[in-house]
UniProtKB/Swiss-Prot annotation:
Glycosylation positions in this chain: 92
Gene Ontology MF terms: calcium ion binding; peptidase activator activity; serine-type endopeptidase activity; toxin activity
Signal peptide residues on this chain, from the entry's feature table: 1-20
Chief localisation class: secreted
Domain EGF-like: 86-122, 129-164
This protein's UniProt keywords: Blood coagulation cascade activating toxin, Calcium, Cleavage on pair of basic residues, Disulfide bond, EGF-like domain, Gamma-carboxyglutamic acid, Glycoprotein, Hemostasis impairing toxin, Hydrolase, Protease, Prothrombin activator, Repeat, Secreted, Serine protease, Signal, Toxin
Record's protein name: Venom prothrombin activator porpharin-D
Known EC number: 3.4.21.6
Main function: Snake prothrombin activator that attacks the hemostatic system of prey. This protein is functionally similar to blood coagulation factor Xa.
Domain Peptidase S1 positions: 210-441
Record note on quaternary structure: Heterodimer of a light chain and a heavy chain; disulfide-linked.
A single cellular component GO annotation: extracellular region
Length: 454
């Protein structure tokens, strides 16, 4: 009787199951109306799928072993894991003087360049002008096992022995307006600009112009001078060195018997506002060769001094060592002028400025059909359709270092206009520092400093 009772109970239970299921469980379509859940990457046979860093370690927390399975490389795994655990300790760039940072868990490690040590590469083993200019803001001079810093004219050495402090409102090489107004846009400006030079015949052409440059805003190129002929037309450029001296190219002096100088202008067409400065004398380097443009340098002495302001400031004159070892090893220089904006066109009414890279001497010499003498250097791009041609000869090639702008070259000559594989050729100012100083010292009026307010 007991076995029969047990069998009846089992049959009764099985008979009731479909009804229970219909009461407890909902159909899939109906259930989805109530249970809204975002699908994850997890699914059937997930462990058999290839590793995915987003699925394993971002959507979910992963282990180091899971990360290793994804990267399949110990070095990559360590680099990822150190950042994954507690963030990137190198994001603040803690390593000084070019040191390389490697992230760790709760720490970082700096690999220092030669001659530097310390957790952040902050200590010099021994001072040398060859390493980061001896930490000098301007000029560095080796003294036994140490270095001695000094500054350009119109600056004094700071109390720290490294920095240079401007002594006047219009100290050389200061470009306050450009730094304040366009600091954020400078990287695009640097990356997007280019200059190469023009050849009109089989000889190097002294006629230079800037093509596709940006407008130089008022006060952004304060050292720019422009040379006008008897008719008041632009034919060359120049660089303000002092209240009465303007640096230019020697071949510019041979182009016109009558020369006037204008400074502080960004729109040369506004004749009612421009003030013409008369030339007293012009000093052309005695070794200048018109056929080759070697020694293409000259200094103009004005009859009346320039009145400095926020928009009119001289460029700083570097030492030869500083120019060769520091300035000309920077990535870019800056040229400016009122030259033509297209081949065969008219000179520009507005001042244009272009940032161009230095070109190594070997590449420079290979690119030219003419001799590149030791008194010349190349700058510019070899392919981009941006150029420097007629009208800007004699103008400035400026290089900035620690917010001070130094004259490094004079726009001289070139081959082709936006011609592939050709660069602009510039007079190398560092070769002529003693000559420039000698001319200025020999002919300097006693009233220059007070009138020019250096």
């Amino acid at each position: 009787m007991a076995p029969q009772l047990l069998l009846c109970l089992i049959l009764t239970f099985l008979w009731s199951l479909p009804e229970a299921e219909s009461n407890v469980f909902l159909k899939s379509k109906e259930a989805n109306r109530f249970l809204q859940r975002t699908k994850r990457s997890n699914s059937l046979f997930e462990e058999f799928r290839p590793g995915n860093i987003e699925r394993e370690c971002i959507e979910e927390k992963c282990s180091k072993e899971e990360a290793r399975e994804i990267f399949k490389d110990n070095e990559k795994t360590e680099a990822f894991w150190n950042v994954y655990v507690d963030g990137d300790q190198c994001s603040s760039n803690p390593c000084h003087y070019g040191g390389t940072c490697k992230d760790g868990i709760g720490s970082y490690t700096c690999t220092c360049l030669p001659n530097y040590e310390g957790k952040n590469c902050e200590h010099l083993l021994f001072k040398s002008c060859r390493f980061f200019n001896g930490n000098c803001w301007h000029f560095c001079k080796p003294v036994q096992n140490d270095t001695q810093c000094s500054c350009a004219e119109s600056y004094r050495l700071g109390d720290d022995g490294h920095s240079c402090v401007a002594e006047g409102d219009f100290s050389c090489g200061r470009n306050i307006k450009a730094r304040n107004k366009r600091e954020a846009s400078l990287p695009d400006f640097v990356q997007s600009q280019n200059a190469t030079l023009l050849k009109k015949s089989d000889n190097p052409s002294p006629d230079i112009r800037i093509i596709n440059g940006m407008d130089c805003k008022l006060g952004e190129c304060p050292w720019q001078a422009v040379l006008l002929d008897k008719e008041g037309d632009v034919f060359c450029g120049g660089t303000i060195l002092s209240p009465i001296y303007v640096l230019t190219a020697a071949h510019c002096i041979t182009q016109s018997k009558h020369i006037s100088v204008v400074v502080g202008e960004i729109d040369i067409s506004r004749k009612e506002t421009r003030h013409l400065l008369s030339v007293d004398k012009a000093y052309v380097h005695t070794k200048f060769v018109l056929a080759t443009y070697d020694y293409d340098i000259a200094i103009i002495q004005l009859k009346t001094p320039i009145q400095f302001s926020e928009n009119v400031v001289p460029a700083c004159l570097p030492t030869a060592d500083f120019a060769n070892q520091v300035l000309m090893k920077q990535d870019f220089g800056i040229i400016s002028g009122f030259g033509h904006t297209r081949s065969g066109g008219q000179t520009s009414n507005t001042l244009k400025v272009v940032t161009i890279p230095y070109v190594d001497r070997h590449t420079c010499m290979l690119s030219s059909d003419f001799r590149i003498t030791p008194n010349m250097f190349c700058a510019g791009y070899d392919t981009l359709p941006r150029d420097a041609c007629q009208g800007d000869s004699g103008g400035p090639h400026i290089t900035a270092y620690r917010d001070t702008h130094f004259i490094t070259g004079i726009i001289s000559w070139g081959e082709g206009c936006a011609k592939k594989g050709k660069y602009g050729v510039y007079t190398k100012v560092s070769n002529f520092i003693p000559w420039i100083k000698a001319v200025m010292r020999k002919h300097q009026p006693s009233t220059e400093s007070s009138t020019g307010r250096l």
